[in-house]
Structure formats: structure tokens, C-alpha cells
């Protein structure tokens, strides 16, 4: 007599949004694996799993739309019997759970950003405290994100992050060092430190800004060769970090410091706690303290009340400062933020035109800066082979958002996951082409 075999569940974790969501998904998958669950993050047509977890983003309109569309897609697949269960977590779920439960009720359950144990229980797993940050990384083997804090205490008028992530909570240095040691044992060479605000690190735990002390502890971890800083805040920046960056070779001469705008009237309305003069001086201090450092920033155009004069001030600032890397976004009018009380008075087409103009300006700046690199030799980490090229990065470039170094695979072989000295032979606005030196 033949018996029907029981289908083994396979859980597919789909991640939308920022690197902090990537980290959260990796923690979730690590917990699931420790519970003996089969888990994947590869959504393929042949085998995408029968239980779906969607880790959503709820930051701005485009991200929210992408998350909603993904939920609808898998809710429809569930209705058609193509998947068995659908669970939703992350920022969109945290922010809009009642609305989502009403509008898309065929999702099995919604969870917020702090409900990992509850999500695991719904997936038939137990939360294991002893894992201490162990996770199933989804990035190339040579780098990993390290989330040093959660939430944010800044009062920025346009930002909904505190609504979804709560107040700032730093992770203890000893916990982060242990996590870094585990990553290094698994082959990670580059740590990318992330938080809503790196510069606030330690104020809650240690009653002082403690980022430099954390960096020193992480730099002592054997196997870690690069440490990269993302998402610093211009107000209250701990300058001892720059002193450490200059003398500690493991800390990349790179910082991501979203400035958002530079016009004093817009900065005041945004509640950024700084001015054009203070910001300009801070950036000059950065470059004086660490000559050659790469500065990445993010700007917002079309904020309520932004005049053509405000925009011209911003353009002049971009031209003057010549940022190494930049992103620019059209303002998104977010419910329950302070700025939502203001009239969203800049037309969408004007917002987008201004964003395009800023990025065109930055493209020329990037072209000029990259041409200066031709003929120079840089130590690069090789992330992957893609098509006809090996793809790497210098210490001045972060994954996914910055320049890449492309090496012709038909002419040269370099080992992925390793450091190689590369001579730059050609450059475009956002890519460098090189060969082993």
C-alpha cells in the first residue's frame, strides 16, 4: 500500500527596502535555520517556497507601492493555490497594519518591526536568544551589514522612520564585536555599519557618543579588513571618529552623511538643527582631517515651500562641494510627520525636474572625479563575476549605491571575495574599468 508523503515546508523570505531590512531578514533566516527550517531568499519561478514572508518598506510613496504590489502578488498566488501561506512584516506592516488587514485580508498574518518572536512562532519556530546576531547572510561572502542601533531620536519633519522603528536603541559593543567575529569566521572581510543615525551611537547605553570606541573594538577583530560608515547625521558629529579614521587603516576613508538640503530656510523647516554655514564648515573639517576621503550624501528636492531660490542655493552648494557620491530624491508627503501639516506645494513634475537637474550636475562632477583616477592603482575587493566582467570596489565605494570597478574577464582572472590591486585604465560617470596591477 502506498502512503502519501508529507510535503516539507520551504520558507521564502522576500526583502524590500534598505540595508536595515536586509539585516533583519538575515536575522530571521538565521533563526529559522537554527530551528531546522528550510529557508530561501531566492524567488525563482521553479521553486520559490510554499510559505512566503515579505519584509516590507514603508518609507516613501514608491517604496510603499512596491511593497503593496508584492503583497498583492503573493496574496493572489495563495488564492490560486500556488503558495500555502503569506506573512507580512517590516515597516509598511508596522505603519499601516490595520489598513492592510482590511484591504488585503487573505494574508495569513501581519507583524511589526519588533515582533520577530511572534513571527517565528507563526512559522513554527522558537526565538533563540543564544544566537546573538548570528544570521544567514544574503550578501556576497566578503561583506556584511552590521546594524549597530535601531530607531531614531532626531526630529526631522519629513521622516516617518521613528513611526516605524521607534526611538534610538544602541547595541552593546561586546554584542557587536561577537557578531563581527562570527561574520569574520565565515569569510566576511568588510563590515558596513548601519543605523538610522551612527553619530548618536552610545548616548543611550553609555551616556556619551561612543562610535569611535566601537570602531576601535571592531578594528581589532581578526579577519576584518574594511569597516565602512553609513548614515551619519551632520549635527553633533563625533570628530574623534575622523582622528581614528586617519590612523586606523581598517576604517575606510568614506562616510555617508545625508544632508537633505542646504538652504537655511528649508533646513529650519526640516528641523535639521544646522545651517548652511555649519554644514559647509563640517565638510571642510572632514576633508582637512582625512585628505582624500569620499563623502556620500543624499538630498531631497521639492520639500514644501522650496522656492527656485532655495533650489539654486542647493545647486551652487553641490557644485562647490563636489561630493564623491550622491543620491537625490523628490520629496514624498508622508502622513503623521510634522511636514505633513505643511502644504505640499511643489508640483510633482517640478520636483522630478529638480531631482533630475541635481543628478545631471552630479553626473558631471562624478565624471571629472573619475577621470582623475585613470592611471592610479587602488586596492579593490572583488564582489562577484557578472557577465563578461569581474566586479569590484575601492574603499571609496559602497555596494549597490556607488561606483564599481569592472575587470574584463576574458583578459584577466581575479578571485572573488579577495583583495586585488587594480590599475584604472578607463572611467565613466559611475564606473571604473581596470586591470590587475
Swiss-Prot record:
Domain MTTase N-terminal: 9-128
Domain Radical SAM core: 138-368
Cofactor info, note text: Binds 2 [4Fe-4S] clusters. One cluster is coordinated with 3 cysteines and an exchangeable S-adenosyl-L-methionine.
Stretches assigned to the TRAM domain: 371-437
Domain of life: Bacteria
Record SUPFAM superfamilies: Radical SAM enzymes
Residues binding [4Fe-4S] cluster 2: 152, 156, 159
GO molecular function term, any single one: aspartic acid methylthiotransferase activity
A Pfam family: UPF0004
Enzyme Commission number(s) of this protein: 2.8.4.4
Catalytic activity: L-aspartate(89)-[ribosomal protein uS12]-hydrogen + (sulfur carrier)-SH + AH2 + 2 S-adenosyl-L-methionine = 3-methylsulfanyl-L-aspartate(89)-[ribosomal protein uS12]-hydrogen + (sulfur carrier)-H + 5'-deoxyadenosine + L-methionine + A + S-adenosyl-L-homocysteine + 2 H(+)
PROSITE patterns the UniProt entry points to: MTTASE_N (PS51449), MTTASE_RADICAL (PS01278), RADICAL_SAM (PS51918), TRAM (PS50926)
GO cellular component: cytosol
Binding-site positions, [4Fe-4S] cluster 1: 18, 57, 91
SMART domains linked to this entry: Elp3
Names of required cofactors: [4Fe-4S] cluster
Any one of the GO BP annotations: tRNA modification
Location(s) in or outside the cell: Cytoplasm
Keywords of this entry: 4Fe-4S, Cytoplasm, Iron, Iron-sulfur, Metal-binding, S-adenosyl-L-methionine, Transferase
Family listed: Belongs to the methylthiotransferase family. RimO subfamily.
Function: Catalyzes the methylthiolation of an aspartic acid residue of ribosomal protein uS12.
Protein name: Ribosomal protein uS12 methylthiotransferase RimO
Gene name of the record: rimO
